[in-house]
């Protein structure tokens, strides 16, 4: 999609920051209007992160107007609010390609643009990186400004406070803009959210205005003692050493620009608190920012199937109905993980701990020690953030905690920061853990039940984003730990499948007349099955939707080497690279994990 110059005359002129700075201040409200309208037009067609970007239009315009980007560093925390930033930095005519194969990245990416100072996708990293950049600029004697824009719940994560704790002590020249829209993907939770609500309250805002009117403006900004006492209101940020300013209207472009200009050359760490409306300018998104956080397409070919997240949510409700010891935990992913119904039906058994994966896992440890049965729902890519807690606080103590690992494997359009392809490799080495890989939605249901009933340590069920294959959900039964299923009997070739590629593998097995086994468990492996198959076949193929290095195939390799089984093995999975964006089907095709690709990989390997 190209710019419609008649519809967006000012935006078409300001599609670079150099041109943006040529505009008069009086023209900026119209620019903000056109930028918001363009976002509405483009994202409604191309799909993608929607509401967050609408809420930061004025902030984005003001930052590029006041600061000398790209020399000055803008760091967008998490990054799903950066669509306006991309448009204003020369990528507007490509914005319809965002999240698509070979298109613009879903989030800021250093490889894509010099204006993207930090590649992001996960939350709460901006202040730490920004502090490092600020220190580097000071050491080099360069008058480079560093600004971190953080919001959408990212301030609740421990890493953000670790960085503020450091920045408040050393007083490096750093500006943190708190984009306070009262939301992550879901509603913000926790004591910090309550504290921000107090800061936003009418009473404190009125007090703030009265004090400002009583002070000479020049004196207000020159005398640090007056500044701190007049506007801090004992905010947590001022108590941590930041020079707190706000809260101010994050949609008043004139006010934002004036404030930025006044503090631009000030020394020390500032936190500017701006109150915004997620979904600003589009009433449905303003009224329901959770629904409109992302616009996505549903594949009509699987419209009659349940999503794996729905399977999990339904199972959770069934268990909670008869087991009051179940405690379900999510780190700010209630909607995406299929837990909305559960949270309403069983509020006393549900905890949203906000964006705090490390806390979520050790919180579950405390519950397990106390006799409860925690279920932690977590995305594969975010599980990485709680790795030490899993080892030190759960596995080492042999605590029975079930981890429902959503978005495992190829996730698709969110790209390399969100692909859930490392979990098998980083989980498999943990002693005592049980790892299950369902091949369909009913298997997922049975494995969740099996993991929940397992009482000898942690268990993991990893399942993909998207919809199942239409399998009927059967009554819950425990699966024997470490036991696989033969799905097809063939000759000479045995395909050991781990997870959701089973259907694709079946098509390949038919063409090759191969034996196909649904291994079900990555740990413990069904060693008796492998030994049996090794005596009946000449070739082994392992198949998984995850990285080959250290994954399920590596587990098979280790076993056959130790047992002196002299069979050639082909490991099929994802290579040693970060997986780019595209639909799940596109990525599987690129890496030859669709049925034809699997067949060809095996066929050509056998011919060598």
UniProtKB/Swiss-Prot annotation:
Its EC number is 2.2.1.7. Keywords: Isoprene biosynthesis, Magnesium, Metal-binding, Thiamine biosynthesis, Thiamine pyrophosphate, Transferase. Thiamine diphosphate binds at residues 80, 121-123, 153-154, 181, 282, 357. Its cofactor is Mg(2+); thiamine diphosphate. It comes from the Bacteria. Pathway: Metabolic intermediate biosynthesis; 1-deoxy-D-xylulose 5-phosphate biosynthesis; 1-deoxy-D-xylulose 5-phosphate from D-glyceraldehyde 3-phosphate and pyruvate: step 1/1. Binds 1 Mg(2+) ion per subunit. Binds 1 thiamine pyrophosphate per subunit. It catalyses: D-glyceraldehyde 3-phosphate + pyruvate + H(+) = 1-deoxy-D-xylulose 5-phosphate + CO2. GO terms for biological process: 1-deoxy-D-xylulose 5-phosphate biosynthetic process; isopentenyl diphosphate biosynthetic process, methylerythritol 4-phosphate pathway; terpenoid biosynthetic process; thiamine biosynthetic process. GO terms for cellular component: cytosol. One of its GO terms (molecular function) is thiamine pyrophosphate binding. Catalyzes the acyloin condensation reaction between C atoms 2 and 3 of pyruvate and glyceraldehyde 3-phosphate to yield 1-deoxy-D-xylulose-5-phosphate (DXP). Belongs to the transketolase family. DXPS subfamily. This is 1-deoxy-D-xylulose-5-phosphate synthase. The lineage of its organism: Bacteria, Pseudomonadati, Pseudomonadota, Gammaproteobacteria, Enterobacterales.
